[in-house]
């Protein structure tokens, strides 16, 4: 009888230990997921100016495009290492009816850099020389024109003393330019991700949690 009671008590203790372990592992996993979760940088077009499209006759032969792109790090405690940031500037091919093909007019590369947590990086640049004939073909009857800016890079997140693997970031946005060659929208234009951009928030934390659970399981 005593042996049966001891077996029952031992079984209860074992169940209690298992439940306690599962609860602790779950809380630890949740804490790590919240701590290691990384948000991708948010990019926007703040300035965009093509002098050749302005009203000044002396600027007709100007073959430059001036811009400023801003990248915001929304993470409170994670820095971001950027590889070279590649920018492609395009316009819509208006020589064909119902055509939406993009015609590249220039490109620019921002050298790799580091961005601290909750910091904003303003990257000014000038693209030259532009093909003014291609640029002028983009002008609509009302004097405005629409261009496309695509951004592509890879980033790594700095978490305490270590860095994550690289994650691809591909975003872009259309920019309307008025009759003065200046970005028509006064506020910054948010650049949205393309379909090929890596889903950072889902894959990175999940992989960490899976490794953690395997570690606990084999102990």
UniProtKB/Swiss-Prot annotation:
Q: What is the effect of changing residue 3 to A?
A: No effect on the interaction with RIN4
**Where is this protein found?**
Cell membrane
Biological process GO annotation list? defense response to bacterium; defense response to fungus; defense response to other organism; plant-type hypersensitive response
- Effect of mutating residue 8 to A: No effect on the interaction with RIN4
Which stretches of the sequence are propeptide?
196-219
Recorded GO cellular component terms are: membrane; plasma membrane; side of membrane
* PANTHER family named among the record's database cross-references: LATE EMBRYOGENESIS ABUNDANT (LEA) HYDROXYPROLINE-RICH GLYCOPROTEIN FAMILY-RELATED, OS05G0367900 PROTEIN
> What protein am I looking at?
Protein NDR1
């Amino acid at each position: 009888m005593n042996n049966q009671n001891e077996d029952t008590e031992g079984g209860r203790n074992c169940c209690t230990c298992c439940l306690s372990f599962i609860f602790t592992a779950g809380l630890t996993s949740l804490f790590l997921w919240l701590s290691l979760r990384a948000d991708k940088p948010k990019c926007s077009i703040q300035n965009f100016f093509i002098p050749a499209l302005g009203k000044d006759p002396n600027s007709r032969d100007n073959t430059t495009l001036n811009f400023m792109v801003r990248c915001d790090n929304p993470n409170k405690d994670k820095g971001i290492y950027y590889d070279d940031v590649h920018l492609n500037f395009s316009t819509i091919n208006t020589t064909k009816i119902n055509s939406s093909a993009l015609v590249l007019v220039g490109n620019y590369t921002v050298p790799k850099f580091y961005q601290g947590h909750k910091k904003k990086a303003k990257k000014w640049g000038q693209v030259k020389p532009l093909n003014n004939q291609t640029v002028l073909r983009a002008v609509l009857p009302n004097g405005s024109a629409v261009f496309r800016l695509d951004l592509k890079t890879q980033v790594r997140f700095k978490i305490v003393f270590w860095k994550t693997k690289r994650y691809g970031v591909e975003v872009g946005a259309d920019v309307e330019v008025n009759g003065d060659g200046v970005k028509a929208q006064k506020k910054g234009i948010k650049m949205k991700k393309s379909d090929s951009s890596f889903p950072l928030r889902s894959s990175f934390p999940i992989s960490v949690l899976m490794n953690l659970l395997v570690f606990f399981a084999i102990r």
